């Protein structure tokens, strides 16, 4: 009002000065300045309250989360229990709701910036599932061997796991009753660890076709996590396989192990045990490291599928005689994993010690594919006893001898593996004063059994 006072002074000294016009002009300037400030404050408050109103509406009608397993934002209606991804269609639907129901107009970019922020808490749905399972008292730690043993608690303390195991009749029943709980506990341990792979074995069911092997293995993923399992073929050399490992609780390899060559089989063993996997999500710029989430299972029609003659400690094969699939479907997998969680907490040893690993090697022999080298070695040679005469032959000499009777291509490496597996004695000898060479104590079966085969083919 300082300008108004000055105008009064001017009026006193100049009687002909018109006060009204000047005073109105001054008041108008001050009013305009006030309106500008009001508009600025209003715009500042409106911008803030608009996003707050959007968040209030979204929180009232929906629940949002950022799925750390799938690396995406998800939401569900407050009245519906199923989470779905937030994509372009969902964003446009939410924009339409805000406009129609709340008269709030906003851009897709702004809506994305709200939802893909701390507004949506980061959640690992699989770990959340296991943490939410009820606590079960299975007895004291000594009942399950503590950390120095792997004895499964009696049926008085466990129910769901023994019931599930009893649905399957296998040829090696005692090992099935021990190894299935080990594998189930390892599933829980592996899912709860973001830095290491805790399940180093693949549970494999072999046998005749139509025995519900694949169906039973699919049941091992609980219904609450049905979206986190993969059943089908995998190719160790492809990048999609790494995504399967990082985004699924169970990977079920369906009748493919027989078709794997030795290189792929070795790659698969590495994939089963790798601590982390690296891959790039669609539309992301960078390759990132992800926890190894998956536990492996597989089904095989027939029994022979292992191509490595030295055996494998990564596979737990069982020949199926029958499966009561209807009874298996009726068993609550929530109860099964609640018991597995309790076993893990009690200190149950879900890993395999040295003696058990040696036993795995022995038991895997029944599931190995017999190579041509092994077949010919068993047909044409034998191990000498202490009082029998024998020859000292190199691998090359053995292959040369067999080449007289068969045109089948044979590999020195596979013959060496066959000799080792069959238990032939390997020794170092010098011939004619030359360098030492490796030879095997061996006896030829005479006449050579291949002669009859060659004669019958002529």
Predicted features, each with a name:
Residues 1-156, 170, 174, 178, ...:
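N-terminal nucleic-acid engagement/recognition segments and initiation subdomains in replication
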Residues 331-363:
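Long, low-complexity, charged/polar intrinsically disordered regions in eukaryotic proteins
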Residues 249-272, 306-311:
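Conserved AAA+/SF3 P-loop NTPase catalytic/coupling segment centered on the Walker-B
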Residues 306-324:
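A short helix-turn-beta junction within AAA+ P-loop NTPase domains corresponding to the substrate/partner-engaging
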Residues 351-458:
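DNA transaction DNA-binding modules
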Residues 119-246:
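P-loop NTPase catalytic core of nucleic-acid-dependent motor ATPases
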Residues 265-288:
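Conserved catalytic/switch belt of AAA+ P-loop NTPases
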Residues 241-246, 281-299:
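AAA+/SF3 P-loop NTPase mechanochemical coupling elements
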């Amino acid at each position: 009002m300082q300008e108004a006072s000055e105008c009064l002074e001017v009026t006193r000294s100049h009687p002909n000065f018109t006060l009204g016009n000047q005073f109105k002009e001054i008041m108008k300037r001050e009013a305009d300045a006030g309106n500008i400030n009001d508009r600025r404050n209003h715009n500042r408050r409106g911008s803030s309250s608009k996003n707050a109103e959007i968040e209030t509406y979204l929180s009232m009608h929906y629940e949002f989360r950022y799925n750390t397993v799938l690396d995406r934002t998800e939401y569900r209606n407050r009245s519906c229990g199923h989470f779905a991804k937030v994509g372009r269609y969902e964003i446009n639907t939410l924009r339409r709701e805000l406009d129609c129901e709340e008269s709030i107009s906003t851009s897709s970019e702004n809506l994305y910036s709200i939802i893909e922020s701390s507004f949506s808490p980061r959640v690992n749905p699989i770990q959340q599932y296991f943490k939410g399972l009820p606590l079960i008292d299975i007895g004291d730690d000594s009942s399950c061997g503590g950390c120095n043993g792997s004895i499964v608690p009696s049926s008085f303390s466990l129910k769901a796991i023994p019931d599930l195991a009893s649905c399957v009749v296998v040829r090696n029943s005692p090992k099935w009753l021990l190894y299935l709980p080990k594998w189930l506990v390892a599933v829980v341990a592996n899912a709860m660890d973001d830095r290491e792979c805790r399940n180093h074995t693949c549970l494999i069911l072999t046998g005749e076709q139509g025995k519900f092997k694949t169906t039973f293995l699919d049941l091992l993923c609980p219904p609450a996590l049905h979206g986190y399992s993969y059943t089908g073929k995998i190719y160790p050399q492809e990048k999609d396989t790494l995504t399967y490992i990082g985004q699924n609780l169970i990977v079920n390899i369906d009748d493919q192990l027989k078709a794997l060559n030795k290189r792929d089989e070795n790659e698969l063993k590495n994939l089963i045990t790798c601590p982390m996997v690296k891959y790039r999500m669609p539309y992301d710029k960078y390759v990132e490291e992800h926890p190894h989430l998956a536990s492996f299972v597989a089904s095989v029609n027939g029994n022979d599928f292992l191509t490595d003659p030295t055996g494998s400690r990564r596979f737990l094969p069982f020949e199926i005689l029958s499966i009561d699939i209807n009874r298996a479907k009726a068993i609550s997998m929530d109860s099964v994993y609640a018991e597995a969680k309790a076993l893990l907490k009690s200190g149950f040893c879900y890993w395999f010690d040295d003696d058990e690993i040696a036993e795995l090697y022995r038991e895997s022999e029944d599931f190995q594919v017999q190579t041509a080298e092994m077949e010919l070695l068993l047909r044409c040679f034998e191990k000498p006893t202490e009082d029998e005469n024998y020859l000292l032959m190199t691998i090359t000499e053995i292959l040369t001898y067999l080449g007289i009777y068969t045109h089948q291509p044979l590999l020195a490496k596979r013959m060496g593996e066959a000799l080792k597996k069959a238990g032939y004695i390997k020794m170092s000898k010098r011939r004619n004063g030359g360098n030492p060479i490796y030879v095997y104590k061996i006896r030829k079966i005479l006449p050579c059994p291949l002669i009859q085969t060659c004669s019958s083919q002529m």
